[in-house]
Amino acid sequence: MMKPLRQQNRQIISYIPRVEPAPPEHAIKMDTFRDVWILRGKYVAFVLTRESFQRSPAFSVPESAQRWANQVRQENEIAD
């Protein structure tokens, strides 16, 4: 007799994908900068453009990450 492929009474977990690359749960938001998060010891900016986030490269100083975010906002003409 073959075993069933999955446990019969186990609930199926529904997965809702996030809009990537959104700031992950373990990222720490910097209060002094609008778009800058601390991620693995580096500074990363996340900018919401239309329906998706754009993620910056990792910077060693938060000002650089914010400058990148400001440029992306200007390029996409995001209104506040």
Swiss-Prot record:
The keyword Cell division applies. It comes from Salmonella typhimurium (strain LT2 / SGSC1412 / ATCC 700720). GO terms for molecular function: DNA binding. Belongs to the CedA family. The keyword Cell cycle applies. This is Cell division activator CedA. Keywords: Cell cycle, Cell division, DNA-binding. Activates the cell division inhibited by chromosomal DNA over-replication. The gene is cedA. Transmembrane segments: none annotated. GO terms for biological process: cell division. Pfam families: CedA. InterPro entries: CedA-like_sf, Cell_div_activator_CedA.
